[in-house]
Amino acid sequence: LAENLAAAFGRPAWDISFHVNMDAASLIGMDTFVDGAVTFRPGPVYRCAQCGGFGVLDEINMAKNEALAVLHAVLDFRRAIDVPGYERIPLAEETRFIATMNYGYAGTRELNEALTSRFAVIQMPTITEENLEKLLRAQFADLTDKYVHQFALLFLDLQKKCDSAEISTKALDLRGMLDALRLRRRGVAAGPALDM
């Protein structure tokens, strides 16, 4: 979705994948040596801000608050980046940031209110049976309608059980099911493929 929005607006996109070891320098940039001299190497948020691109802040709820604090001035009325030891750069007018996150995965947490308030939060609905079957047909054209329907029902049944707390949410992973189907293509039996 985020990449499609960038393409629709004709803007370059930076995919910034967050993790627990992410720090402010990873986002805005850091000093490095080039030909024996100290030079500033811009990070993805800095480059996105200069070019008027779309910054896709992927899995933003994996990062620590200290790393995310640099985004506050970027995302509010200031629309600027303070680069310690260098300068304050304004964001190009076209610059936009889109954050994505999944709940309930290991290492994720709730975002603090100061950061959340700088975004328009869109809760994505869960996939419908019809759309799941379309996705399966698009990804696996060799799958018969019978199996497309069975895998869609399997996923939706697991989803219902997760929603009612009958099973762990770890059992439900659309990406995992798609990977299992790819393994099936390579000859792995259905049971072991789903176990992986």
Question: How would you label these PLM feature ranges?
Answer:
Residues 133-196:
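Conserved AAA+ ATPase small/helical "lid" subdomain
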Residues 1-156, 163:
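AAA+ P-loop NTPase catalytic core and its hallmark functional loops
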